[in-house]
Regions:
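Active-site neighborhoods and metal-handling regions in enzymes and metal-associated proteins
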Residues: 1-322
Length: 322
């Protein structure tokens, strides 16, 4: 298996650094005692510090491969695989990983023409969906940070305040964390669509000021040791709008109904049916999913890209699924 998703690399080895913008991966072979971390030379020190791997399982490629096309780090990876005599076997790759580029795959196909490549279908992501008790504690720490930062958001988002100033305070709260748990950078920027922007879920802050009577969506995540626990809330500034208030009440009722179905043995679809059953009762339409699996995250996403709380998702909920 060649795993290029930085969250999977972290899960498999403990590796944690802002180096995912260029080629890196973890190799997993059934006959090897440990995974192998493949990184650029400049970042290998991070693997010595952050991972549990023996030095021999940290392989670094020379800096001459950085942004010097047609040369590419995966050419070096091909030679590593050949040296280990793994060039005539089935190899799984993460075809839809954000950081597994077309060039990465092309170099593998060209350099390892005796191997057969197969989509791993998010194998590691699906393993990550069920957390250990220790991971749950990290998720709970992230949740406490989210709660604190959301309270900060409620305090600082007011008519006349610039959006960017509010985000500065929110970010400070997220990084400060709590006395027990320090914060970390999130995989997604603070999302703050306001006014007409609430029709587009993923807008970030501008220098514009908040306006009395408008709604603002706040989507943030506390992060502790790369584990995320996102939270989203909507606030109305000043002047009441009964339609928005009624919609919020119905949405909260739908959330409570969905949460009541979050039990081991139920499916994600069971939760979704309870949620949308309430929305349907009030004539409210929502086309997008209402939840997804979370855990370790790196930009550009804190979702695990597996379970969705949406109609038709038959994933069975288990203890410690987050």
């Amino acid at each position: 298996l060649i795993s290029s998703d930085p969250a999977n690399m972290n899960y498999l080895t403990g590796y944690d650094a802002w180096s995912f913008y260029y080629a890196q991966c973890v190799l997993v072979h059934i006959n090897e005692d440990e995974p192998i971390c493949f990184l650029r030379d400049q970042d290998a020190g991070g693997a010595y510090i952050k991972t549990y791997l023996q030095d021999k399982n940290i392989i670094k490629y020379p800096e001459k491969y950085i942004h010097t096309p047609p040369s590419h780090p995966y050419e070096y990876l091909v030679e590593v695989i050949k040296q280990k005599k793994w060039d005539n076997i089935r190899i799984g790759v993460e075809m839809d990983s954000h950081y597994f580029t077309a060039t990465c795959f092309e170099k593998l196909l060209t350099g390892l023409n005796r191997a057969s490549f197969h989509d791993s279908e998010r194998l590691v992501n699906w393993i990550r969906i069920v957390k250990s008790d220790s991971e749950i504690k990290l998720m709970q720490a992230a949740a406490r940070i989210s709660e604190k930062a959301m309270k900060t958001a409620f305090d600082v988002i007011n008519p006349g305040v610039r959006q960017c100033d509010a985000v500065a305070d929110i970010q400070k709260s997220l990084f400060n964390g709590t006395p027990e748990f320090g914060g970390d950078y999130a995989s997604i920027a603070t999302l703050l669509p306001t006014g007409k922007g609430t029709s587009a879920s993923h807008l970030t802050a501008t220098e514009d000021k908040f306006v009395k009577g408008e709604a603002t969506i706040i989507e943030i995540s506390g992060v502790h040791k790369r584990y995320h626990c996102p939270m989203a809330r909507t606030v109305l500034l000043g002047k009441k709008n009964q339609k928005k208030i009624d919609t919020m009440k119905a949405t909260n009722e739908a959330l409570d109904s969905g949460i009541s179905a979050v039990k081991p043995g139920n499916t994600a679809n069971d939760v979704a049916q309870k949620f949308w059953g309430v929305l349907d009762k009030y004539g409210i339409k929502k086309e997008s999913r209402t939840g997804y699996s979370i855990g370790i995250g790196y930009p550009p996403d804190w979702g695990e890209q597996t379970l969705n709380i949406s109609k038709g998702d038959k994933t069975i909920l288990q203890p410690n699924v987050t």
